[in-house]
Amino acid sequence: MSLQSQVSGRLAQLRAAGQLLVSLRPWPGRSAGGPRPRGSACGPLVALGEHGYCAWLSAGVGAWGAAGRGAWVRTWAPLAMAAKVDLSTSTDWKEAKSFLKGLSDKQREEHYFCKDFIKLKKIPTWKETAKGLAVKVEDPKYKKDKQLNEKISLYRGDITKLEVDAIVNAANSSLLGGGGVDGCIHRAAGSLLTDECRTLQNCETGKAKITCGYRLPAKYVIHTVGPIAVGQPTASQAAELRSCYLSSLDLLLEHRLRSVAFPCISTGVFGYPNEEAAEVVLASLREWLEQHKDKVDRLIICVFLEKDEGIYRERLPHYFPVA
């Protein structure tokens, strides 16, 4: 069933509920006890749309009295549960993407694959994290900048649970999912993500492409392909890794997004040494933020391994000094 058909069906159910409850709640634009608008009893519902009608109907529950509240529980609550749109394989990805873009942040929550998602405000900035660390560096690579220290975060955890504007996927060139964080993101977002990725026709190393986040708390997924390093990385591979981050940030600006979380790109099975990768990442993010700090709220370095967390805690003060 298409998304349009699903929503049309929900509206039909809501209209039926409205006919039952119309005597219990004033219509929009009608004072309590005033005459009902002429014409179809459900005419105003069409103009309100599904979410507008939901808000209007819910707002009036307290004014209905015991009888009205009882009718609401028996009739409206089951219909509200039924109004959840299915983001399974039966839905076209284009329709699902359009539908999700029209929702508020609160409305999107019912479509998340998880309930224990992490809001941006719960992720400490580097300025906050560094307070509890011995992070003084004698000769940092860059000057102290309090504003930049509030724009960068180090977070250890599951990137798929972050409620940010975008998360970055360390993808392979096919963009169709794989191992590691790539597979985790595809499983959490659902099959519609793979459906959209099929239309992107691969991605070159160092480049990035963007899709909807679907069932993820993140609104978008930025897919980038890192270099495969065998042994010590070459200058060309370092440039490609840097390009992964900068290309992703270009898309962030292009789509007017303000928060993004990066995984460790090219480390692990792609063979890029963790320490060398961290140097490339931190230099790239620092230099980019110096140019665009007013256009973003947060850049998050999201690590999964304790080893990577230790590397970034040790290297961050060299690029984002706090003392």
Curated annotation (Swiss-Prot):
Residues that bind substrate: 157-159, 170-172, 177-182, 265-271, 304
Record Pfam families: Macro
Regulation (activators, inhibitors): Subject to competitive inhibition by the product ADP-ribose.
One of the record's GO cellular component terms: nucleus
Gene Ontology molecular function terms on file: ADP-ribosylglutamate hydrolase activity; hydrolase activity, acting on glycosyl bonds; O-acetyl-ADP-ribose deacetylase activity
Function according to Swiss-Prot or TrEMBL: Removes ADP-ribose from aspartate and glutamate residues in proteins bearing a single ADP-ribose moiety. Inactive towards proteins bearing poly-ADP-ribose. Deacetylates O-acetyl-ADP ribose, a signaling molecule generated by the deacetylation of acetylated lysine residues in histones and other proteins. Plays a role in estrogen signaling. Binds to androgen receptor (AR) and amplifies the transactivation function of AR in response to androgen.
Record-linked InterPro entries: Macro_dom (IPR002589), Macro_dom-like (IPR043472)
Keyword Hydrolase carried by entry: yes
A GO BP annotation: purine nucleoside metabolic process
Record-linked PROSITE patterns: MACRO (PS51154)
Keywords carried by this UniProt record: Acetylation, DNA damage, Hydrolase, Isopeptide bond, Nucleus, Ubl conjugation
Its EC number(s): 3.1.1.106, 3.2.2.-
Quaternary structure note: Interacts with ESR1; Interacts in a manner that is estrogen independent but is enhanced by estrogen. Interacts (via macro domain) with AR.
Residues bearing PTM N6-succinyllysine: 94, 101, 127
N6-acetyllysine: residues bearing it: 161
Catalytic activity, as annotated: 3''-O-acetyl-ADP-D-ribose + H2O = ADP-D-ribose + acetate + H(+); 2''-O-acetyl-ADP-D-ribose + H2O = ADP-D-ribose + acetate + H(+); 4-O-(ADP-D-ribosyl)-L-aspartyl-[protein] + H2O = L-aspartyl-[protein] + ADP-D-ribose + H(+); 5-O-(ADP-D-ribosyl)-L-glutamyl-[protein] + H2O = L-glutamyl-[protein] + ADP-D-ribose + H(+)
Similarity-based family: Belongs to the MacroD-type family. MacroD1/2-like subfamily.
Gene3D superfamilies: Leucine Aminopeptidase, subunit E, domain 1
Protein name: ADP-ribose glycohydrolase MACROD1
Cross-link type Glycyl lysine isopeptide (Lys-Gly) (interchain with G-Cter in SUMO2), residue numbers: 136
